[in-house]
Amino acid sequence: MMSKSMSISVNGQSQVPPGFRFHPTEEELLQYYLRKKVNSIEIDLDVIRDVDLNKLEPWDIQEMCKIGTTPQNDWYFFSHKDKKYPTGTRTNRATAAGFWKATGRDKIIYSNGRRIGMRKTLVFYKGRAPHGQKSDWIMHEYRLDDNIISPEDVTVHEVVSIIGEASQDEGWVVCRIFKKKNLHKTLNSPVGGASLSGGGDTPKTTSSQIFNEDTLDQFLELMGRSCKEELNLDPFMKLPNLESPNSQAINNCHVSSPDTNHNIHVSNVVDTSFVTSWAALDRLVASQLNGPTSYSITAVNESHVGHDHLALPSVRSPYPSLNRSASYHAGLTQEYTPEMELWNTTTSSLSSSPGPFCHVSNGSG
């Protein structure tokens, strides 16, 4: 009794419990609803109405096939295919305002590996063929496909009987209509008028611009931090390795600090990350700005402008143990540049001094 009362339609709408939503699968539409319709078997909850597709427009079907009061995105109905010509096989899908046009190939629907039906996709065009205006209304038309029978399963008599019954009711189909989402609403977005593809590319461009701005901020912050490190470590600044034919590799370098007036032994103590960080910084600038590649020695030389006491020749210390010259072993791994040539020329001109660049004292000597 419950099922009979729930199948009653009032004001063109099926009476269902509140919150009821109808979302059957393709297999359920074919195996349960359409098969029962074809075989005239009562459906437990009759929420799919019979519709004459040639007399109703899509928006009329939308109003007629509502199920309850819950908002819907698709609508279902049964329809009996009307032949366009009495002796032909073409289906008449014209309405008063337009026509339904098939598109693409029919899709085979399977259940447990067995073919049970077909799905045809149609688009509604306003006007008359062949100059109709395409709309956003789409229809999926499902039909049963029971004629594929294995010869080993049934006899010839049974095959003829089944084919006869199928041809008698083959006109019934179950349909689902819905409106295609209009993605062209992006034309009204603040980013400006653009096509659908252009609207998809706009966020990428914006993200790229934001990424470049963030990278530039990181670059400036890194430059400021590196310069601050150099200012704090000026008394212990270690110049990059220079290539000189008169230099020999030594491991230790002694520097006198004017604040403590004591010998400070510097041997792999000063962290050289701030020196090598210039090379990473240069590579970052080159990759972001696509400019010519800079080298760490150029950046170091420019950062030392105004600090002449770091480039003075060795000064005699009042302590005899410190009166030793030091030099750096060739260790540059960058490519040869004109700046290096200028630096090497300066180094060669100072080769007659007791020691180049390493032994530094801020004492009055």
From Swiss-Prot:
Presence of keyword Transcription: yes
Domain notes per entry: The NAC domain includes a DNA-binding domain and a dimerization domain.
Tissue specificity: Expressed in various aboveground tissues undergoing thickening of the lignified secondary wall such as anthers, filaments of stamens, the base of carpels, styles, the boundaries between siliques and pedicels, the midrib of leaf veins, and inflorescence stems, specifically in interfascicular fibers (sclerenchyma), cells differentiating into vascular vessels, and xylary fibers (secondary xylem).
Annotated ranges, domain NAC: 16-180
Gene designation per UniProt: NAC043
Compartmental location: Nucleus
Function statement: Transcription activator of genes involved in biosynthesis of secondary walls. Together with NST2 and NST3, required for the secondary cell wall thickening of sclerenchymatous fibers, secondary xylem (tracheary elements), and of the anther endocethium, which is necessary for anther dehiscence. May also regulate the secondary cell wall lignification of other tissues.
Predominant location: nucleus
Keyword Heme: no
Organism domain of life: Eukaryota
GO cellular-component term (any): nucleus
Entry's Gene Ontology BP terms: fruit dehiscence; plant-type secondary cell wall biogenesis; positive regulation of DNA-templated transcription
DNA-binding positions: 116-186
Protein name from the UniProt record: NAC domain-containing protein 43
Disulfide bridge partners, by residue number: none
Record keywords, A-Z: DNA-binding, Nucleus, Transcription, Transcription regulation
One GO MF term attached to the UniProt entry: DNA binding
InterPro entries named in the record: NAC-dom (IPR003441), NAC_dom_sf (IPR036093)
